[in-house]
């Protein structure tokens, strides 16, 4: 029994010893092998200009626009406007039946002549004391009341006409001749598109960055690939107490405004003063970990490392990856503007292949076009 136990102990010790010797030999073999490198792409950071922008959304509106509706109930007697017709201020577009009002006006005008003659006769008789002043005043009051009644009837007739409030373009007429309409019935929309505008709202924190005449660039889903230029023409002098935002209006350049329709949703970019000598890198150069944003720089090999790799044909392309923490100030398209001194002009920043490396990794700089560092030639809806 003791012999068997001794044999098992010897076998166990032998296995442990063999594995230890094997591990040492493998470690020596690995240590003697040249360090492998990971391929990466990179670019040298150059000073660039950067134009910060404020991104927001807005709604396009005309210079003037109104949905015309009736002030009185009645039957439509005439429709004088066509769908899409250009109209002038004061032009009659639709007229309601006013035959009763016109008949009343004729009767009132006929009575006015008799009342005028009575009043004039009483004025002459007053001088000869044939009538009292009270009788003359009553005659004058009757005459004045009739004049006012006539003016009221004329106004009532005019209110039965729907006229263009300004020069513009009519939309789709919503009523027909003979149709009975009630007060407030929508008739037709008229819009003055001579100067198209866009209304939007911004945080009050951006108020100091705005000024009249500031350039605004707009895009719409209805016209993909096109941009429309405008300038800020009005800034609300008070903050909206319910939203905490300030209302702003911009006016489109004439050549761009006629391409837009009222009510269009638009995405806006408000250009701020250009900043020079900025550190700008492709966004693909920035990675993320649990502590925030990171990037990798190419660090030259030490002289000692170069000596050990003197026989490597890739030596002039080999670097050490240095992991740094970066802080993004702004992003536009495929580029990011960095703040702080972690990345300086002249540094070589890795733009591809970061997934397989860590701080201090040996990397090979593959000089080729960088995917994700160039804006696409044509934008798509996606």
Curated annotation (Swiss-Prot):
Q: Which UniProt keywords are present, listed alphabetically? A: Membrane, Transmembrane, Transmembrane helix
Q: Where would you say this protein principally sits, based on its record?
A: membrane
Gene3D superfamilies to which the protein is assigned, alphabetical: 2.40.30.170, 2.40.420.20, 2.40.50.100, Helix hairpin bin
UniProt topology in membrane: Single-pass membrane protein
Q: Which NCBIfam families match?
A: RND_mfp
> A Pfam family this protein belongs to?
HlyD_D23
Q: Where in the cell is it found?
A: Membrane
Give the molecular function GO annotations: efflux transmembrane transporter activity
State the similarity comment: Belongs to the membrane fusion protein (MFP) (TC 8.A.1) family.
Could you give one GO CC term from the UniProt record? efflux pump complex
Annotated TM spans: 1-21
The record lists the organism as Haemophilus influenzae (strain ATCC 51907 / DSM 11121 / KW20 / Rd)
Q: Which PANTHER family match?
A: BLL4320 PROTEIN (PTHR30469:SF11), MULTIDRUG RESISTANCE PROTEIN MDTA (PTHR30469)
Protein name in the entry: Uncharacterized protein HI_0894
InterPro entries given in the database record: CusB_D23, RND_pump_MFP
């Amino acid at each position: 029994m003791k012999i068997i136990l001794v044999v098992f102990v010897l076998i166990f010790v032998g296995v442990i010893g063999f594995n230890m010797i094997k591990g040492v030999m493998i470690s020596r073999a690995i240590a003697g092998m040249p360090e492998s490198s990971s391929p990466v792409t990179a670019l040298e950071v150059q000073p660039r200009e950067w134009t910060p922008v404020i991104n927001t959304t807005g709604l396009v509106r005309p210079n003037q626009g109104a949905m015309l509706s009736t002030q009185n109930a009645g039957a439509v007697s005439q429709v004088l406007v066509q769908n899409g017709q250009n109209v002038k201020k004061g032009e009659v577009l639709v007229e309601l039946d006013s035959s009763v009002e016109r008949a009343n006006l004729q009767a009132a005008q006929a009575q006015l002549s008799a009342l005028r003659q009575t009043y004039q006769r009483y004025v002459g008789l007053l001088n000869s004391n044939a009538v009292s002043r009270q009788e003359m005043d009553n005659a004058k009051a009757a005459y004045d009341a009739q004049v006012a009644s006539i003016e009221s009837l004329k106004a009532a007739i005019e209110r039965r006409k729907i006229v263009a409030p300004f020069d513009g373009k009519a939309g789709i007429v919503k009523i027909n001749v003979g149709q009975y309409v009630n007060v407030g019935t929508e008739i037709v929309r008229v819009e003055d598109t001579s100067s198209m505008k866009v209304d939007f709202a911004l945080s009050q924190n951006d108020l100091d960055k705005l000024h009249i005449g500031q350039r605004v660039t707009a895009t719409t889903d209805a016209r993909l690939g096109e941009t429309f230029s405008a300038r800020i023409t009005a800034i609300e002098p008070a903050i909206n107490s319910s939203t905490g935002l300030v209302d702003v209006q911009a006016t489109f350049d004439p050549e761009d405004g006629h391409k837009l329709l009222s009510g269009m949703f638009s995405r806006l970019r408000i250009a701020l003063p250009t900043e020079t000598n900025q550190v700008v890198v492709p966004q693909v150069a920035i990675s993320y970990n649990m502590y925030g944003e990171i990037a990798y720089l190419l660090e030259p090999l030490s002289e000692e490392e170069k000596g050990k790799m003197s026989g490597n044909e890739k030596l002039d392309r080999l670097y050490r990856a240095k992991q740094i923490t970066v802080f993004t100030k702004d992003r536009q398209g495929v580029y990011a503007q960095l703040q702080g001194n972690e990345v300086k002009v002249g540094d070589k920043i890795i733009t591809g292949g970061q997934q397989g490396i860590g701080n201090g990794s040996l990397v090979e700089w593959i000089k080729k076009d960088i995917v994700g560092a160039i804006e696409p030639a044509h934008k798509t809806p996606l």
